[in-house]
Amino acid sequence: MASLSGSWRDAYKGMSSDNIKGLVLALSSSLFIGASFIVKKKGLKRAGASGLRAGSGGYSYLLEPLWWVGMITMIVGEIANFAAYAFAPAILVTPLGALSIIISAALAHVILHEKLHTFGLLGCVLCVVGSITIVLHAPQEQEIDSVLQVWNLATEPAFLLYAAAVVGAAIILIVQFVPQYGQSHVMVYIGVCSLVGSLSVMSVKALGIALKLTFSGMNQLIYPQTWVFTLIVLTCVITQMNYLNKALDTFNTAVVSPIYYVMFTSLTILASVIMFKDWDRQDGTQIVTELCGFVTILSGTFLLHKTKDMVDGSSSLGNLALRLPKQLEDSNGFEQEGIPLTLRRHECTKSPRPMRQFILPQDGPEAV
């Protein structure tokens, strides 16, 4: 028993001061980013009512003040997130983004009038429990004293292979799939955001380390590698924002937020493990515990997504009756599952047997 207790003490040595700073910054980031999703969604709706929608290639949202409020809120959150990566490993910082989904769900309940089911509340609890598990078992930040050291990690064969695969997949999605399937399949836009996002996080961490070292008296701005990382960050962030705007404007927030989180976080953790070798400094128990925490967060986001528009105490037919009118009103013609209603109607007209679409209000079905 004593040896077992000693092994646990060796495995868990507490959080370092840098990890604590990164944790506080990551929590602040989740607060701002979660709020920005709702504010930007409202701005995109307003802009779409008076001009070409972002999902159709329009940029009228750039003239909408509310969208800019959401954008500034997101920028503040991203700055806090940027700083968090300079102090803590990506395995600690990135999964905490699930808290932004909780904040987004709470604000959607208040502002967008999207009811939160009891199982949605359970999903929030699971996200918090999973986040705490990861925080308690996250690896300590690697000691890095120069941006050249980060550059050496980024140019190792394993990470170069990963980066090439990500860039290739993103280009294929943009060129081949976005024009044909972007408006009907949510995974296309989010796939581009997530793939590019994993590279942006690695570059953000490298740039954050360079700035942290510069502010501490070791100037890293004299190295060209610092500016290469800066260029990569700008390119990736612009690409992310463009396709994230398209996803938010085309599909329901309840669909975009959890799927984007799952894909982005999974790819970022994979990139961090390859580049910074975070798991090389941990034993099997800690790694498995972190993975369990991550799976717990995924379970929470799944519950939040699946029960977003369910009403407590309603039967399945009752839920359908309450959900269909809401989707038609809140999603601007798009179904909750991410498929545009116009496409579904078009498919119905192609059917050899005529089909009638029913809208089910609470007092009974009515054919339209």
From Swiss-Prot:
Q: List the disulfide bonds.
A: none
Stretches assigned to the Extracellular side: 1-18, 88-90, 137-157, 211-220, 277-283
Identify the GO cellular component terms for this protein: early endosome; plasma membrane
Carries keyword Signal?
A: no
Checking SUPFAM superfamilies in the record gives: Multidrug resistance efflux transporter EmrE
Q: Which UniProt keywords apply?
A: Cell membrane, Endosome, Ion transport, Magnesium, Membrane, Transmembrane, Transmembrane helix, Transport
The UniProt record lists the keyword Ion transport: yes
Kindly list the residue ranges recorded as spanning the membrane.
Answer: 19-39, 67-87, 91-111, 116-136, 158-178, 190-210, 221-241, 256-276, 284-304
Which molecular-function annotations from GO does this UniProt entry contain?
magnesium ion transmembrane transporter activity
Q: Which residues lie on this side of the membrane: Cytoplasmic?
A: 40-66, 112-115, 179-189, 242-255, 305-368
Q: What is one GO biological process annotated to this record?
A: magnesium ion transport
Where is it mostly found?
A: membrane
**Topology relative to the membrane, per the entry?**
Multi-pass membrane protein
Subcellular location per UniProt equals:
Cell membrane; Early endosome
Q: Which family does it belong to?
A: Belongs to the NIPA (TC 2.A.7) family.
Q: What does the record note on quaternary structure? A: Homodimer.
Question: What exactly does this protein do?
Answer: Acts as a Mg(2+) transporter. Can also transport other divalent cations such as Fe(2+), Sr(2+), Ba(2+), Mn(2+) and Co(2+) but to a much less extent than Mg(2+).
Please report the name of this protein according to its UniProt entry.
Probable magnesium transporter NIPA3
**Which organism does this sequence originate in?**
Arabidopsis thaliana
